Amino acid sequence: MHFMILATLCYIKQDGCTLMLHRIKKPNDMHVGKWNGLGGKFEAGETPEECVRREVQEESGLALQNPRLHGLLMFPNFKGNDWYVFVFTATDFSGELIDSPEGHLEWIADEKLTRLNLWESDHIFFPWIEQGRFFSAKFEYEGDILTTYEVRFPVTEV
């Protein structure tokens, strides 16, 4: 059965580094071996901000204040489901890092991020985050291979 999955993704930034999660602890993880930001699936009734705060707390032990929404990602039929992902960054947080149940947490220098084993789409949308451009993008994969993508940069002024 094909489902629509809502999720969040957050890149926590501090002193020229980004907190990344090396997904190595769960053998059946669709992201096993990849480096990702933090985040995960919505629970019933959550807003994107509530979801990203809960997921970051669960995965890292950090409590976010004022996460900033940067864009929306859509991955149609990715591993059998349609994924809609709200992408955030955060620079304001408290707490101490825990031993994550999802993988190994590490602060990575921003200039070294693209050298990590990332999903191909991450290489494309990282610059949009750094440029501060709000984006809405669709990335289509066949297996683990990115086949096509499209992006819009909607005007976000009110």
Across the structure, where does each feature detected by a protein language model lie?
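A generic fold-level signal
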Residues: 5, 13, 29-30, 80, ...
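Conserved N-terminal beta-strand and adjoining loop/helix that marks the start
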Residues: 1-20, 41
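Recognition helices and adjacent regulatory flanks at domain boundaries
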Residues: 3, 17-19, 28, 54-58, ...
